[in-house]
Swiss-Prot record:
InterPro entries the UniProt entry points to: CAT-like_dom_sf (IPR023213)
Record flagged with keyword Transferase: yes
GO MF annotation terms: acyltransferase activity
PANTHER family listed in its UniProt record: F21J9.9 (PTHR31623:SF17)
Matches recorded under Gene3D superfamilies: Chloramphenicol acetyltransferase-like domain
Function: Acetyltransferase involved in the biosynthesis of the benzylisoquinoline alkaloid noscapine. Converts (13S,14R)-1,13-dihydroxy-N-methylcanadine to (13S,14R)-13-O-acetyl-1-hydroxy-N-methylcanadine.
Protein name per the record: (13S,14R)-1,13-dihydroxy-N-methylcanadine 13-O-acetyltransferase AT1
GO biological process terms on file: alkaloid metabolic process
The keyword Metal-binding belongs to this UniProt entry's keyword annotation: no
Protein's gene: AT1
Family of this protein: Belongs to the plant acyltransferase family.
Catalytic reactions of this protein: (13S,14R)-1,13-dihydroxy-N-methylcanadine + acetyl-CoA = (13S,14R)-13-O-acetyl-1-hydroxy-N-methylcanadine + CoA
Pathway linked to the protein: Alkaloid biosynthesis
Enzyme Commission code: 2.3.1.285
Length: 471
């Protein structure tokens, strides 16, 4: 494969897409929720890959027609997702002034399959240059870049501000846009965003989590620490369906006997495998924590729709005590045989899953739980770790988020569903030890991106290979 570089990227055009109709005066000031206020002012990239059409006219005029429909549909969709076309006034209010979103058309001198095969090295070339360089949200809340490859394939990159949207809101926006575009391709009217009313946004998060006026002037940019970005690396791992199924089956009986738990989910199993590998890589005596982001909408009473706009994602933290973390390190644990070692590993994996599930099950939609969630956002990390300041330096903290079952592979713009949906991890000190999970096209495997320091990554890969041999 030829070496890819920025020279392979040619920006054809840039324009601003505004809502088709002006936002009504009474909706001009959109108040963010408290959870929005604590969210970072960074773009989250989402890239959807679509293969070339099978007909002979898959390039040229067809690309032009597709882009025209996409831009028209964006204009219509923004009428309903009007905060995305606005600008932030401060850390409390979005001025829904219809200034619009940025739209780039880019030609890629290369084949889409080459980018997919060498994704770790080349995905950043598919991002808008301003996102690839700094990633801070300055003006537009959304940037869309349509990357057209020589082979006729297309990769659409959506960069959406995490300040106003979590993954659930992002996919609702993308699927609404896809539905509108698909309707337009069939020659129907695009007077509505989609016939699926589940994709029409509602704006109820502010009433559930009222904003704090004290935070209005505080914008949460990514903070810097002593970690050098050069030492931070991001790698992609694929957990295939067969491995995940094998792990779920082996852990199921253990979890039922020990905890009376149901079969672990795909995400729980992969989380445990990553956690276990990271713990084995940590210094002896380290406390291990996993902070998992979870969609709060279905935990509410009554449950909220997926189309509820904004950040309705809360975090749960599971803490593995130092004694347990120490015993998983081969330098401090002796086993009498290979079979015993395998059984110990399976026991620990089931313990990890049960511990994480217990923390997730604690999250309810009642007022008391919501107040605890708010306190956690205000005061930071989990109290069970923070209360002992002497051990804070010995904490190995992982931060996990999952897009599994969010429906990204259902985004059909009329070209069929995407063959791959992925992100480009943020290589910033704040995102050290970040773990991101997403579905594979088959629906059963899981793609994982991890950010570790270079030395930690080497150890992590070694221990992960060892653990996966159990399944």
């Amino acid at each position: 494969m030829a070496t890819m570089s920025s020279a392979a990227v040619e920006v054809i055009s840039k324009e601003t897409i505004k809502p088709r109709n002006p936002t009504p005066y009474q909706l001009r000031n959109y108040n963010m929720s408290l959870l929005d206020q604590y969210s970072s002012l960074v773009y989250v990239p989402i890239i959807l890959f679509y293969p070339a059409a099978s007909d002979a006219n898959s390039t040229g005029s067809k690309h032009h027609d597709d882009l025209h429909l996409l831009k028209r549909s964006l204009s219509e969709t923004l009428v309903h997702f009007y905060p995305m076309a606005g600008r932030m006034k401060d850390n409390m209010t979005v001025d829904c002034n219809d200034e619009g979103i940025d739209f780039f058309e880019v030609r890629i001198k290369g084949r889409m399959c080459d980018f997919m095969m060498k994704s770790d090295a080349h995905l950043s070339l598919l991002l808008p240059s301003e996102v690839a360089s700094t990633n801070f949200v300055k003006e537009a809340q959304v940037i869309v870049q349509v990357n057209m490859f020589d082979c006729g394939g297309t990769a659409i990159c959506f960069c959406i501000s995490n300040k106003i949207a979590d993954a659930c809101t992002m996919i609702t926006f993308i699927r609404s846009l896809a539905g509108t575009t698909n309707i337009a391709r069939r020659g129907s009217s695009i007077a509505a965003p989609t016939t699926n009313q589940n994709l029409v946004p509602s704006f109820d998060s502010t009433s559930l989590f009222p904003p704090s006026e004290q935070l209005a002037s505080q914008v949460s940019y990514p903070t810097q620490d002593s970690t050098s970005v050069d030492k931070l690396v991001s790698k992609r791992f694929v957990f295939d369906a067969a491995k995940i199924t094998s792990a779920r089956e082996k852990l199921q009986s253990l979890m039922h006997d020990k905890y009376k738990c149901h079969r672990p989910t795909r995400v729980e199993v992969v989380s445990a495998l990553i956690w276990k590998s990271a713990v084995k890589s940590a210094p002896p005596g380290s406390i291990s924590t996993v902070t998992h982001a979870m969609n709060f909408r279905k935990k509410m009473d009554p449950p909220l729709q997926d189309a509820s706009f904004g950040n309705l994602c809360v975090v749960v933290t599971a803490v593995l005590p130092a004694t347990t973390a120490t015993t998983t390190n081969p330098a401090t644990k002796k086993v009498s045989s290979t079979s015993n070692e395998e059984q110990v590993a399976l026991d620990e994996l089931s313990d990890f899953v049960a511990l994480l599930r217990r923390e997730i099950d604690k999250v309810k939609g009642d007022k008391g739980c919501m107040e605890k969630i708010i306190q956690k956002f205000i005061y930071g990390h989990d109290a069970s770790v923070a209360k002992d300041s002497d051990v804070e330096d010995k904490v190995t903290a992982l931060f996990m988020t999952s897009w599994c079952k969010f429906g990204f592979y259902e985004a059909d713009f009329g070209w069929g569903t995407p063959v791959w949906v992925t992100t480009v991890p943020l290589i910033e000190p704040k995102y050290k030890n970040m773990v991101f999970m997403n579905d594979m096209k088959c629906g059963e495997g899981i793609e994982v991106w991890v950010n570790f320091l270079e030395d930690d990554m080497t150890k992590f890969e070694h221990h992960l290979r060892e653990i996966l041999q159990l399944f």
